[in-house]
Design a protein with these regions (language model features):
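Bacterial N-terminal signal peptides that target proteins for export
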Residues: 5-21
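Sec-dependent N-terminal signal peptides
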Residues: 20-28
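Zymogen propeptides
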Residues: 34-130, 203-204
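Active-site-adjacent helix-turn-beta-strand microarchitecture at beta-sheet edges
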Residues: 108-178
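Conserved, well-ordered active-site substructure
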Residues: 111-127, 186, 195, 199-208, ...
């Protein structure tokens, strides 16, 4: 397997390393976070070929929505956290949804917070991760309030620890309705933590998309904030709990590469 040589190299910036490890996807992904580009307003226009047919299913633990291009999950949560080291198990009935959050640097058998991209807060405790240039934004949560931050988010993440909350850095896709600079080559299943109409949700593409198209469809769905979430075989293992409390797997577990997960609790 090919490993990232230095912690300061973000896996997203050299995404071919992860792709080489899983041996399934050959597209080279290159993030252009350092380019001096201006945010672009999200287009609200729809072409005749891009219909938006919403299908909403409301359950006790979660509301599901979908369009032709997107699958949307609205967890009915009372609290949330960034769980690190060991992914929450389906036997923990307090968990209603879980998926990967920040990037993981190297493929290691032993867990360390330093292998998570960017400084982060888990269970109210502040941890230092490795520097990652692709992390252009962050998400923080404390006292049942959340916030998306674009750039200069270090103080906000530290404050989340002071307030016994959670927080992590990632690649910002949409901030206040504006598309942020993010240029990735190749089609992939994409996932993001989003805010739409004041509600928090997880949104995933239903088929492999260029990242620029995924962002476009998020905008058309009405997303005003979007932070990328880690994906790829070994990182995409995720699930939610249905009305009967039965776990529904979004992506089954294949490889143990993940290090951190955004976790919603009832």
């Amino acid at each position: 397997m090919v490993h990232a040589k230095k912690y300061y190299l973000c896996r997203m910036m050299s995404y071919q390393c992860k792709i080489g490890c899983i041996g399934l996807v050959t597209a080279l992904m290159i993030c252009s976070c350092n380019e001096q580009k201006q945010p672009h307003p999200m287009s609200s226009s729809l072409s005749s070929n891009d219909t938006m047919e919403d299908t909403i299913q409301i359950y006790h633990h979660i509301t599901l929505d979908s369009t032709e291009q997107l699958q949307i999950y609205y967890p009915h949560f009372k609290r949330m956290d960034l769980v690190c080291g060991a992914m929450p198990q389906p036997t923990d009935t307090s968990v209603i949804m879980v998926c990967a959050a920040a990037f993981t640097g190297q493929l290691k058998k032993e867990f360390s917070h330093e292998n998570i991209a960017g400084n982060h807060v888990s269970g109210g405790v502040y941890h230092k991760g490795y520097p990652c240039k692709a992390n252009t934004g962050a998400f923080v949560y404390a006292h049942r309030q959340w916030k998306f931050i674009y750039q200069d988010y270090a103080a906000e993440v530290a404050q989340a620890a002071d307030e016994s909350g959670m927080g992590f850095g990632q690649m910002m896709l949409i901030n206040n309705g504006l598309r942020m600079p993010a240029n990735v080559v190749g089609k992939n299943i994409c996932r993001a933590l989003c805010e739409r109409k004041g509600k928090l949700c997880i949104i995933e593409s239903r088929q492999p998309l260029l990242l620029i198209d995924f962002i476009k469809f998020l905008g058309r769905y009405g997303v005003t904030q979007a932070l990328y979430l880690d994906m790829g075989e070994g990182w995409n293992y995720s699930w939610y709990r249905d009305n009967q409390g039965i776990v529904q797997y979004i992506h089954p577990k294949t490889l143990d590469y993940g290090t951190n997960w955004i976790t919603f609790y009832r």
